[in-house]
Amino acid sequence: MSLFDHTVSELHTLLQKKEVSISDLVDESYRRIGEVEEKVQAFLTLNEEQARAKAKELDDKLAKGEETNPLFGLPIGIKDNIVTKGLRTTCASKILYNFDPIYDATVMERLNAAGAITIGKLNMDEFAMGSSTENSGFQLTRNPWDLERVPGGSSGGSAAAVAAGEVPFSLGSDTGGSIRQPAAFCGVVGLKPTYGRVSRFGLVAFASSLDQIGPITRTVEDNAYLLQVIAGVDPMDSTSANIDVPNYVEALTGDIKGLKIAVPKEYLGEGVAEEVRQSVLAALSVLEKLGATWEEVSLPHSKYALATYYLLASSEASANLARFDGVRYGYRTDNAKNLIDMYKQTRSEGFGSEVKRRIMLGTFALSSGYYDAYYKKAQKVRTLIKRDFENVFEQYDVIIGPTTPTPAFKIGEKTSDPLTMYMNDILTIPVNLAGVPAISVPCGFVDGLPVGLQIIGKHFDESTVYRVAHAFEQATDYHKQKPVL
C-alpha cells in the first residue's frame, strides 16, 4: 500500500503521531515518480533538491509541535502555467523554455505558508490551449488507465500525476474544462471554483475572464482541504471576490435529503456516448436513494456555447499572448534582420500550431470589420448562457450531467481535426462562460476507462457542490479504483 492511498486527513494524523515523517512522504513521491514517470510523463520539471531540504526543515518544526495545518508537509504537483519563484515555468511552450520566475503566484504563497511541498511542475497543453495535453511543446503525457490514450487537457499532467500516485494532489487551471475533463479521463476529482473564488495572480493568462485555478485530488474531502487553503480575496487580483470563505470540510455532512437536482436534456442528448449516459443515470439513482430528487430541465443556449467560447477565449488569448515577443524573457530567434522581423520570427518559431491558430482566430474576431459580428455578439450570447443557469438555479440546488461526452480517446485520434477536439469540451465550457463552480467525480467505467460526473453549483456555493459530490462518493467505490502501472 502506498502512503498516497491515504487521504489528507489520514496523512496528517500519521504525521502527528510520528508514524511517518515529512521526508518519508517526499521520498515516496520521488520513488513513485522514478517507478512510473517514464510511462506517464506527467512532470516537466522536478524540484527534488529544494523539496528534500524543505521536508527536513518542516520535520524539525513538526518535532517541536509547531504546525497543525492539514496540508503541512504534504507533497503537491503544480501545473506549469502557475509561476513558482526560482522554479522554471514554461506553460509547456518553447517560447518560455528558460523562464525562471522571480515571484510566486498567490496560490503558491498560500500553499507555502500552509507547509505544502512542491514536488515539481506538471505538463499541459501549451498555454492551456487543448483538451488532450498533445499540444505540449515538450512531451506527451499518457493516461495511467491506458497508456495509449490521452489524459485529457489542458491540465493532463496534473490529473495523470494524481491518478498514477506520484503526488497526493495537484493544482490545475480551468478555462473551458481543463481541470474537470482530465479529472474525468483519469478517474480523479477536479474542481473549477467560481470565477473570483481563487486568485489568478501568477497564473499565466490564456483568457482572463474565464481562467480559474483549482484542485485535483483523489477524494472530495482532499479537494475541500486544498481549496480551503488557496481560496479568498487577493489585493493583487482585482477580479478576486471579497466574499468570506466558508469551511468546506464542514460541509461534507453526507446529508442531501430534499436536495433538488436539475439534469439538462442537452447534456444527455446527441453526441454523448450511451455508456456515459447510463453511468450518469445510475449516479442519479444513487443520489435519489440518498434522498435527493431530480428533474429534466433545459439550458437552451448551451448549443451556442462552443462557438461563443472559441470567439471570446481566442480574442482574449490574442491580446494576452502579445507580451511574448522575445524582448524581455523567453525564447528569442537568432535569425532576425530587424526588430519587427524579430517579433515575427520569435513568435513563429516559439509558439506551437494550436496557439498560433487561436491567436489568428482571436485577432480576426477583434478586427474592426468583424468586431460587432463576432466578438460583440459572442459577449451577448454569453450573457444568455449565464441567464440560463440563473433561471435553473432559482428552482434547483445543483445541475448534474456527464463531464465529457466520451471516456478518454486514443492518442492521435483527434489531432488532425481541431473541431472534433474542441467538441470534447462541449459539456464543460458553458460552466466557464457562466462563471459558476463545478466538480468532476468518478461515476463509473466504460471498457476499463473512467467516466466523470459533473456537479454544477450556484455562484460561490462550492459547499453544496462538495456536499453532493462527497455524498455520492461515500455511497460508491469508484474513487478507490486505481490504475495498474
From Swiss-Prot:
Record-level GO cellular component terms: glutamyl-tRNA(Gln) amidotransferase complex
Record: active site: 79 (charge relay system), 154 (charge relay system), 178 (acyl-ester intermediate)
Pfam family, one: Amidase
InterPro entries (alphabetical): Amidase, Amidase_CS, Amidase_dom, AS_sf, GatA
PROSITE patterns: AMIDASES
UniProt entry tagged with the keyword Zinc: no
Keyword tags: ATP-binding, Ligase, Nucleotide-binding, Protein biosynthesis
Catalytic activity reported: L-glutamyl-tRNA(Gln) + L-glutamine + ATP + H2O = L-glutaminyl-tRNA(Gln) + L-glutamate + ADP + phosphate + H(+)
One annotated GO biological process: translation
EC number: 6.3.5.7
Gene3D superfamilies: Amidase signature (AS) domain
One Gene Ontology term of the molecular function aspect: glutaminyl-tRNA synthase (glutamine-hydrolyzing) activity
Function, as annotated: Allows the formation of correctly charged Gln-tRNA(Gln) through the transamidation of misacylated Glu-tRNA(Gln) in organisms which lack glutaminyl-tRNA synthetase. The reaction takes place in the presence of glutamine and ATP through an activated gamma-phospho-Glu-tRNA(Gln).
Similarity remark: Belongs to the amidase family. GatA subfamily.
Subunit record text: Heterotrimer of A, B and C subunits.
Protein name: Glutamyl-tRNA(Gln) amidotransferase subunit A
Organism: Geobacillus thermodenitrificans (strain NG80-2)
